[in-house]
From Swiss-Prot:
Organism: Onion yellows phytoplasma (strain OY-M)
Binding site for NAD(+): 35-39, 84-85, 113, 136, 170, 285, 309
UniProt protein name: DNA ligase
Binding site for Zn(2+): 403, 406, 421, 426
Xref: Gene3D superfamilies: 5' to 3' exonuclease, C-terminal subdomain, 6.20.10.30, BRCT domain, DNA ligase/mRNA capping enzyme, Helix hairpin bin, Nucleic acid-binding proteins
Enzyme Commission numbers on file: 6.5.1.2
Primary role: DNA ligase that catalyzes the formation of phosphodiester linkages between 5'-phosphoryl and 3'-hydroxyl groups in double-stranded DNA using NAD as a coenzyme and as the energy source for the reaction. It is essential for DNA replication and repair of damaged DNA.
Family listed: Belongs to the NAD-dependent DNA ligase family. LigA subfamily.
Enzymatic reactions: NAD(+) + (deoxyribonucleotide)n-3'-hydroxyl + 5'-phospho-(deoxyribonucleotide)m = (deoxyribonucleotide)n+m + AMP + beta-nicotinamide D-nucleotide
Length: 671
């Protein structure tokens, strides 16, 4: 006979352990259980809840797994309206906001918080248990997304106190999670999300909560909507929320005058560049909550708070032409030629438009007036079309039917957004493949620029990568070409010869296999070690690698099923190009860095960032970009940034270059 009391107690115990582990991992970045221990406990809890569903707790961590499918979202009225904030865009407007408060309240303080670029949400708890989650909606009515919210790992299902309260927060998608999601969607041939906010919004509205669980959404909670539970100040409220188990944003400051406020705003400009999530401004609010009612609100927004929006550096230009280019894989990419304009410190004259669907979505036309900015402060992008300036002269952009280089009819696979030229003899594709082969992240033959490649191609000296390694046989032809002196020819031939020593991961990337980027080539080279192993691998075997999906596996199979590709690989091997990994997959020599998580910051004098990363990985290290308590070491060079300060606060061991060099020299790893 089963003892149900013991079963109930066991379930409660497992829930308590797993809830604590989740909080340690996702909120404090300080796990107290290994992955194996956590998985074992979770599996045990799932088994017990499956056998005894009557004992499943409403705040069980198994809810984080998802799997509930809604038919549609119901609409529920907010207990307290979710008001939007007014905006200010410059220091004069901030001063006006400040002065309006001073007229009514001579003595007060302000609290500044980051304005997270995400999706506003309201969370309702009864006796400390999450019972409802609503989107902002129109501020009065919101959609019930409770099942989805339960899967978000940084939303506590049970608070540390049994309170009835409603909190407000912002759901967001971090940059790493966004990049991973889009990489997966690209692999699955699905439309990419344009930015993390859109991805977060689209994810929250998924009817299947299992999809939400997979996308690693996060939350920052910033306020309590129940007046009787709030603390005297906003600062104390944030501390209280953190104590209850919520994740609050750490970047808040309390200031007592306008001069201090300006200093803090300057500080945020530095902070913003180091964040792993999007923020579009600063929220400035009166810190003392009792003063909020004195200042009041308009019908749309409170007067006691405002949002200072970070300036987006944009410029206006005119679309002069839209051309279509063919790449090394045959993909057709539209490029927008615009009237040259300065954007964020550099002259921009063209903008890549990704694909024809992108053109249609933004309705970009020749002679349109457009607003241009730099996405991620790097890549020029058309932010929007100024349709108020459009006339009858602007006609919809039509997709071309033939390859712009070889006039082959273009093809588009069902469900794909890209058009392709499938002609293997397309001149432009061949040139682009050669340019890719010699590029920095591939074979790194930097003396061969684009114009040199084209000149050699037009002279029938090269048509495929293996021809580069036969150029020395045509030295007499090179000597007759204008601009190619003896020294230049020697430099070219020496650089080509030196490239034979490049590692397997570089050569694999240089081959230009569809969907095989630099990171994927590193993963494949590390796993398979040789080109022969990769050739013989089935898609089923390849997809057993965690980072590799079926689309990449099929692309590899298709590449090695082509006799021309096999012949080219064979020629390259015969000519001395290495197709074997220089780094052993599992180094037997243990080092101080074996299985240790390491972050790099600053500039090393002896090594480039790529070189030291490869050395550390060969010594068994795991290189990460962001710094947290999970990291074992921080390696610092000159001009180290804020990561050094953070590591000191977190008491993470710091290794300087001199000490690092001694560790490398004392290791038994062959470099």
């Amino acid at each position: 006979m089963q003892n149900f009391d013991l079963i109930k107690q066991k379930i409660k115990s497992l829930v308590k352990q797993l809830t604590k582990a989740n909080y340690q991992y996702y909120n404090l970045s300080n796990p107290d259980l290994s992955d194996q221990q956590y998985d074992a406990l979770l599996k045990e809890l799932i088994n017990l809840e499956t056998r005894y569903p009557q004992f499943k707790l409403p705040y069980s961590p198994t809810l984080k797994i998802g799997g509930f499918v809604e038919k549609k979202f119901s609409t529920i009225k907010h207990k307290t309206p979710m008001m939007s904030l007014g905006n200010v865009f410059n220091l004069e407007e901030i001063k006006a906001f400040y002065d309006r408060i001073v007229k009514k309240i001579p003595t007060f303080s302000l609290l500044t918080e980051l304005k997270i670029d995400g999706v506003a949400i309201s969370l309702k708890y009864q006796k400390g248990i999450l019972v409802q989650a609503l989107t902002r909606g129109n501020g009065i009515w919101g959609e019930d997304i409770t099942k989805n919210a339960q899967t978000i790992k940084t939303i506590p299902l049970r608070l540390k106190e049994d309170l009835d309260l409603e909190v407000r927060g912002e759901i967001y998608l971090s940059h790493p999670a966004f990049e991973k999601l889009n990489a997966q969607r690209k692999q699955e041939n699905k439309p990419l999300f344009s930015n993390p906010r859109n991805a977060a919004s689209g994810t929250l509205r998924q009817l299947n909560s299992a999809i939400v669980a997979q996308r690693n959404l996060s939350i920052f909670v910033y306020g309590i909507s129940d007046p009787y539970l709030t603390k005297p100040t906003q600062k104390e409220t944030l501390v209280f929320l953190t104590a209850l188990g919520f994740t609050t944003n750490p970047h808040y400051y309390c200031v007592s005058n306008f001069e201090n406020l300006l200093s803090v705003i300057e500080k945020y400009k530095t902070i913003k560049e180091q964040l792993t999530y999007d923020t579009d401004g600063i929220v400035i609010k009166i810190n003392e909550l009792a003063f909020h009612s004195l200042i009041g609100a308009t019908a749309k927004a409170p007067r006691w708070a405002t949002a200072y929006k970070f300036a987006t550096i944009t410029s206006q230009s005119i679309v002069q032409n839209i051309i279509f280019q063919v790449g090394r894989t045959g993909v057709i990419t539209p490029v927008c030629k615009i009237m040259p304009v300065m954007v964020d410190g550099s002259l921009v004259s063209k903008v890549v438009l990704h694909n024809y669907d992108y053109i249609c979505k933004k309705d970009i036309r020749i002679k349109d007036h457009v607003i241009v900015h730099k996405a991620g402060s790097v890549i020029p992008e058309i932010l929007e079309v100024i349709k108020s300036k459009r006339t009858d002269l602007q006609k919809p952009t039509l997709m071309i039917e033939k390859c712009p280089a070889c006039q082959t009819i273009l093809e588009k696979q069902p469900g794909e957004v890209d058009y392709f030229c499938l002609n293997p003899n397309c001149r432009e594709q061949k040139i682009q493949k050669l340019i890719h082969f010699v590029s920095k992240n591939a074979m790194d033959i930097n003396v061969l620029g684009e114009q040199t490649i084209i000149a050699f191609f037009d002279k029938n000296l090269i048509a495929k990568p293996s021809d580069l390694y036969l150029l020395k046989k045509h030295k007499h032809i090179l000597q007759e070409m204008p601009g190619f002196g003896a020294k230049k020819i020697t430099n070219i031939l020496d650089a080509i010869e030196a490239s034979k020593q490049k590692g397997f991961e570089d050569v694999l990337f240089a081959l230009g296999i569809k969907h095989i980027g630099k990171k994927v080539s590193q993963v494949l080279a590390k796993h398979f070690q040789t080109i022969e192993n990769l050739q013989q691998a089935t898609p089923e075997l390849i997809t057993q690698i965690r980072e590799i999906g079926i689309k990449i596996a099929q692309s590899i199979q298709q590449y090695f099923s082509n006799s021309c590709n096999l012949e080219e690989v064979s020629k390259l091997k015969t000519l001395g190009v290495s197709f074997q990994s220089t780094n052993p997959q599992n180094p037997t020599t243990q080092t101080i860095f074996t299985n240790k998580k390491i972050v790099l910051t600053g500039t090393l004098q002896k090594y480039s960032r790529l070189q030291i990363q490869q050395i550390l990985e060969q010594m068994g290290a795991i290189i990460t970009n962001s710094l947290s308590l999970q990291n074992n070491y921080l390696i610092v060079g000159i001009n180290a940034g804020s990561k050094l300060t953070k590591a000191q606060k977190l008491q993470i061991p710091i290794i300087e270059e001199k000490e690092l060099q001694q560790i490398i020299e004392n290791s038994q790893i062959k470099l």
